[in-house]
C-alpha cells in the first residue's frame, strides 16, 4: 500500500471514565502515580463467589454529566461512553455547529453490552411477567447503543458502527476509524470502547472458565508478566478518542496529542478462547500495523501491551513481541496498564489508546504495577512498578480477543 497518498490522521480530543478516574486528568494522574484501582466488588454480594475483586468505576454520577431523563434510558456502559465522548468533544475544542456532520462518524466497541440490564430485567420478568419489563430494555441492552447515542447526541451522520470483537474491539474501533479518515470517507471520528459487566452473570461466566483471578489481595491480583499471575481482574469503563484529518485540525488550530499512522487486524483462526501457539496471530497483526504505517520495528519505543495477567496471554504476547522485534524487543519498553485498571474487555482498547496517546504527548511511559516476581521465561522491560519519563517517537497498542481477534494500532509523537 502506498501510504504517501493517504491523508494523515491525528488525535485532537480524549475522554475516559475508568477505574483509575472519571476524567482524563484524574485517570492519567493516577496512572502516572502507579495507583492500582483493584478492590473488593461492591456491585453485588460475592459471598457465594470465589472471585472477590474487580476494578470498579467509583463515584460516577451519571446525572451530573448526562440529562437525568436520558441517563435513565441508558445502561451503565452507555453512560460511561457518553460521558467520555462529551469530554473528548469538549477537549477537542471543536465547534460542532461549524462542521459537516455527514463527514463525522462513530465507531465504538462493546463486547457484551448491557449485561447487568439483561440480568435485572430477567429478574423483573420472572417476578412480574415478561411483558412488564422496561420498555427501554432492548435499546438499553444492545451493544451498539453507545455508538448510536453518540451519533444522536452530536448529530453525527457519517458511518456509525460497533465492533463486537471481544477484547480487541476498542482497538479495532480506533484502527477502523483511522482508516475511514485516512481513506477519505470521513473527516472526523469518535472512536474507542465501553464496557460494564461486573455483575453476577458476568463474573460468574468468566469465573466458570477459570479466567479470573481469585486472589484476596488487590496488590496481587492483576499482575501481568508476574510469575504468579493466575487470571485477569474484571474492570469497567470507557475510553474515547476524537480523530481528525490533519489539515482540518491544523486549519482550526486544534491541540494535537499524537498521530495515528498504522493499523493491523487479523484472526488466529485457531481456538475460540486460547491464543495461537507462540502468539503467531498477534505477531502477524503487529507486522500488519507496522507495514500499514511504513514503520520499521526499530522505530517503536513503547508498547502498551494487552497484558491480561493470564498465563497464556502474557506468554504468547511476549513471544509475539520477540518474534516481530528481534533484538530490539529487549531495548523497547512494554507495559500493561491493566495492572491498574483491570481488564475492560471491549472497553480496554479505547482506554489504552487514550493512555498511549498521552504517553507520547507527555513523554511518560506508564508502569506495570505490582510486578513483584518477574517471570524468568518472559524477561522484557515491562517498566516494573514505577513509570518513567521517556520521549519515544512511535508507540504501539495491542489488543487480543476471544475468537482469535487481534488488533494493533501504531501512534506517532506529534512534533507540531
Describe the predicted segments one by one:
Residues 81-94, 143-146, 151-154, 159-195, ...:
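Active-site-proximal alpha-helical scaffold in enzymes
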Residues 13, 31, 85, 106, ...:
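Conserved small-residue
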Residues 11, 24, 32-165, 194-203, ...:
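Conserved beta-ketoacyl condensing-enzyme motif
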Residues 47-56, 113-117, 196-222, 264-284, ...:
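Active-site-adjacent elements of ketosynthase-type condensing enzymes
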Residues 8-12, 36-39, 217-293, 301-302, ...:
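Condensing-enzyme catalytic core mediating Claisen C-C bond formation in acyl metabolism
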Residues 127-134, 175, 179, 188, ...:
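Glycine-/small-residue-rich "gating" segment that lines the acyl/pantetheine channel
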Residues 45, 88-100, 248-256, 286-302, ...:
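Phosphate/pyrophosphate-binding loops at sites that engage ATP/ADP/AMP, CoA/4′-phosphopantetheine
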Residues 1-70, 247-259, 355-368, 412-416:
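ACP-dependent fatty acid/polyketide chain-elongation machinery
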Amino acid at each position: 500500500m502506498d501510504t504517501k497518498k493517504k491523508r494523515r490522521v491525528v488525535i485532537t480530543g480524549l475522554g475516559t471514565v475508568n477505574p483509575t478516574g472519571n476524567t482524563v486528568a484524574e485517570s492519567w494522574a493516577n496512572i502516572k502515580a502507579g495507583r492500582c484501582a483493584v478492590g473488593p466488588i461492591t456491585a453485588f454480594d460475592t459471598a457465594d463467589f470465589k472471585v472477590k475483586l474487580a476494578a470498579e468505576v467509583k463515584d460516577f454520577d451519571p446525572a451530573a454529566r448526562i440529562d437525568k431523563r436520558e441517563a435513565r434510558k441508558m445502561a451503565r456502559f452507555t453512560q460511561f461512553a457518553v460521558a467520555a465522548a462529551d469530554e473528548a468533544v469538549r477537549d477537542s475544542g471543536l465547534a460542532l455547529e461549524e462542521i459537516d456532520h455527514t463527514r463525522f462518524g462513530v465507531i465504538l466497541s462493546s463486547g457484551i453490552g448491557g449485561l447487568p440490564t439483561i440480568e435485572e430485567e430477567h429478574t423483573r420478568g420472572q417476578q412480574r411477567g415478561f411483558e412488564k419489563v422496561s420498555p427501554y430494555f432492548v435499546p438499553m441492552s444492545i451493544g451498539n447503543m453507545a455508538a448510536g447515542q453518540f451519533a444522536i447526541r452530536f448529530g453525527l451522520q457519517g458511518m456509525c458502527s460497533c465492533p463486537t470483537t471481544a477484547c480487541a474491539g476498542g482497538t479495532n474501533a480506533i484502527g477502523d476509524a483511522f482508516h475511514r479518515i485516512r481513506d477519505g470517507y470521513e473527516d472526523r471520528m469518535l472512536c474507542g470502547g465501553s464496557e460494564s459487566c461486573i455483575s453476577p452473570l458476568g463474573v460468574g461466566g468468566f469465573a466458570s472458565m477459570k479466567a479470573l483471578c481469585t486472589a484476596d489481595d488487590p496488590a496481587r491480583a492483576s499482575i501481568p508478566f508476574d510469575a504468579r499471575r493466575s487470571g485477569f481482574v474484571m474492570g469497567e469503563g470507557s475510553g474515547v478518542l476524537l480523530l481528525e484529518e490533519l489539515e482540518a485540525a491544523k486549519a482550526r488550530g486544534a491541540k494535537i496529542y499524537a498521530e495515528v499512522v498504522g493499523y493491523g487486524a487479523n484472526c488466529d483462526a485457531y481456538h475460540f478462547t486460547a491464543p495461537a501457539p507462540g502468539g503467531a496471530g498477534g505477531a502477524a497483526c503487529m507486522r500488519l500495523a507496522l507495514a500499514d504505517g511504513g514503520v520499521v520495528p526499530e522505530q517503536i519505543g513503547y508498547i502498551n501491551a494487552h497484558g491480561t495477567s493470564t498465563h497464556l496471554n502474557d506468554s504468547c504476547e511476549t513471544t509475539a513481541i520477540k518474534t516481530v522485534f528481534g533484538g530490539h524487543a529487549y531495548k523497547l519498553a512494554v507495559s500493561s496498564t491493566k495492572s491498574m485498571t483491570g481488564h475492560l474487555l471491549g472497553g480496554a482498547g479505547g482506554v489504552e489508546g487514550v493512555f498511549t496517546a498521552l504517553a507520547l504527548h507527555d513523554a511518560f511511559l506508564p508502569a506495570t504495577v505490582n510486578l513483584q516476581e518477574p517471570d524468568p521465561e518472559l524477561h522484557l522491560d515491562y517498566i516494573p512498578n514505577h513509570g518513567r519519563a521517556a520521549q519515544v517517537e512511535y508507540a504501539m497498542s495491542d489488543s487480543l480477543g476471544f475468537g482469535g481477534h487481534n488488533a494493533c494500532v501504531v501512534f506517532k509523537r506529534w512534533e507540531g
